[in-house]
Amino acid sequence: MASLGQILFWSIISIIIILAGAIALIIGFGISGRHSITVTTVASAGNIGEDGILSCTFEPDIKLSDIVIQWLKEGVLGLVHEFKEGKDELSEQDEMFRGRTAVFADQVIVGNASLRLKNVQLTDAGTYKCYIITSKGKGNANLEYKTGAFSMPEVNVDYNASSETLRCEAPRWFPQPTVVWASQVDQGANFSEVSNTSFELNSENVTMKVVSVLYNVTINNTYSCMIENDIAKATGDIKVTESEIKRRSHLQLLNSKASLCVSSFFAISWALLPLSPYLMLK
């Protein structure tokens, strides 16, 4: 027959087992309630020396205090950026990103975790991860960030040339782009034998100025100077008539993966100028 002490001992053990089981169930229900949330990134490119955006969105959560945003970069030990409890937490930020990052704090509650990166450097290129925790769950997504230099070209009539000539200039490109001329009238024509392109290294010894000259230009025609590398494609158009010159330019950021959204901008500016009286175009 069991003694009173043994009965008490086994009773306590039973209670402990029951409590442990209850705690395990509570934890289990808590974990099961936190599901994976959708996090979406958009591949993008940064222009050296300017500010860039690494785009990331997630399922909105009205509980700002529960939202944690972490940006990480492959090959970097420290964090790129962290936002938690409604403010930046930069104690573990890697040195290479100090003073250069920020999230859009007023837009976090609506699901915007995009990162602003100041003064983009070549070394900022790489694979980034946007990691999100909310009261609804957690999730992450990677993005490829390319860095280089790109700028809008401008095409002008070269009044100093001895023949009918167009001059296309763009101040900053990297890596070295290709330059191709095209004509609306002579579609498909190869202008490589009547054009000359040069690249001049800028003062920071990274980016280069692009200058391309097209000879034997004819009147009442639209010419396009197309500059392209693996990051961006820019086009400068010029239309020369008997009475005026019209210009247009646009630039689009390219993406190595067509399935992802293209980060781009399109700017058009027309300039209407009187044709020089001494410019004689055939």
Swiss-Prot record:
N-glycosylated. One of its GO terms (biological process) is response to protozoan. Coiled coil: none annotated. One of its GO terms (molecular function) is signaling receptor binding. It comes from the Eukaryota. It is a single-pass type I membrane protein. One of its GO terms (cellular component) is external side of plasma membrane. Residues 35-146, 153-241 form the Ig-like V-type domain. Disulfide bonds join 56-130, 168-225. Residues 1-24 form the signal peptide. Residues 25-259 are extracellular. It is found in: Cell membrane. The chain crosses the membrane at residues 260-280. Induction: Up-regulated by IL6/interleukin-6 and IL10/interleukin-10 and inhibited by CSF2/GM-CSF and IL4/interleukin-4 on antigen-presenting cells (APCs). Glycans are attached at residue 216. Belongs to the immunoglobulin superfamily. BTN/MOG family. This is V-set domain-containing T-cell activation inhibitor 1. It comes from Homo sapiens. The lineage of its organism: Eukaryota, Metazoa, Chordata, Craniata, Vertebrata.
